[in-house]
Amino acid sequence: MIEFRLYLVTDRRLVTARPLEDAVADACRAGVRAVQLREKDLDAKSLFELALRLRRIASSSRAALLVNDRADIARAACADGVHCPEGGFPPAVARRILGERAIIGVSTHSLEAALEAEKHGADFITFGPVFETPSKFQYGAPQGLERLRDVATAVRIPVFAIGGTTPERVRMCLDCGARGVAVVSAILGSADIERAVRDFEQAMGGL
């Protein structure tokens, strides 16, 4: 069962003045209960070592750690699960590798992909980009709130809106049926990460 509502996705390029681990620790201390390690440019060894460090931080705050795409590294680092890209590792295969208790998320950018992810055993999906955002420009124009509503209505698993999500936009996403929001720059790009997390918590009425 997915209990979190705010899903932090890492991008260490946004954290230039200190280690990513410190920023994630601040976010978890403020209430984040799920973190996706998404650093696609790192080699396997560096990603594994970072996953180990983030796993310790997440565990100390009772937060879940998911590793983007790499089920092997998620298993080696004893992470809580894996987040599969659209068209990437099938959720059912990821579960065979990580076990039945693993959390399996899937990125989706269309209604068809959302239905496919649910069919193949995803525990939750992200859908977007809902709003315009530089971090998701490669996925094309924003999907918008109506498509988010269509997806949230069509699937029975939790949907997290991603792409340009800010505290001011949270209520619109929840009103469309989203379970919560996935966030990158609005938290990691903030000068006060703990305050940014609290702003999301206030907008959602709890994390």
Task: Walk through the language-model features, giving the residues of each.
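Conserved N-terminal beta1-alpha1 strand-loop-helix module at the mouth
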Residues: 1-89, 96-123, 140, 146, ...
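As written
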Residues: 121, 176-179
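Glycine/threonine-rich flexible loop motifs
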Residues: 135-137
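A short, flexible beta-alpha/helix-coil linker loop
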Residues: 12, 131-133
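Flexible glycine-rich beta->alpha loop in the catalytic core of nucleotide-sugar glycosyltransferases
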Residues: 72, 130-131, 179, 186-187
